[in-house]
Amino acid sequence: MNILLINGPNLNLLGTREPEIYGNKTLNDIEKDLNKVAKEKSINLECFQSNHEGEIVDKIQSSVSSISGILINAGAFTHTSISIRDALIGSKIPFVELHISNIFSREEFRKESFLTDKAIGIISGFGITSYFLALEGIIEFLSINN
């Protein structure tokens, strides 16, 4: 089983950007820890991060034939990107939307997601643990539905 983790803009700054909201772990730390969990479950996890909307769209489109499921923390693109939404829909790859913070308890503009209604699930507000919960969720979903 191949799963793609996509991280959007500014998530490369984890560990230094607003640690009171996002914690102290770097994206590299999170990816290493997630890969350990994935390997224990015989899952191939590919990690991708970009600050550029088009690169994320390209990655989704190029993954159609090789990826079983997607985990996506689209960052600020969650609230703005119709093109990422359309790429996810067009790919027909099941995806879990995830967020470190609870986007529904933050600023008004963060409460709207262009992805939620098309995701198989959403994990939000559990800090870095959101990544691990999302991984467990997509594995379970794919195990039942494939």
From Swiss-Prot:
The active site is at 22 (proton acceptor), 99 (proton donor). Its EC number is 4.2.1.10. Pathway: Metabolic intermediate biosynthesis; chorismate biosynthesis; chorismate from D-erythrose 4-phosphate and phosphoenolpyruvate: step 3/7. One of its GO terms (molecular function) is 3-dehydroquinate dehydratase activity. Substrate binds at residues 73, 79, 86, 100-101, 110. One of its GO terms (biological process) is quinate catabolic process. It comes from the Bacteria. Keywords: Amino-acid biosynthesis, Aromatic amino acid biosynthesis, Lyase. Pfam families: DHquinase_II. The keyword Lyase applies. InterPro entries: DHquinase_II (IPR001874), DHquinase_II_CS (IPR018509), DHquinase_II_sf (IPR036441). The record marks 17 as: Transition state stabilizer. It catalyses: 3-dehydroquinate = 3-dehydroshikimate + H2O. Catalyzes a trans-dehydration via an enolate intermediate. HAMAP family: AroQ. Belongs to the type-II 3-dehydroquinase family. Homododecamer. This is 3-dehydroquinate dehydratase. It comes from Prochlorococcus marinus subsp. pastoris (strain CCMP1986 / NIES-2087 / MED4).
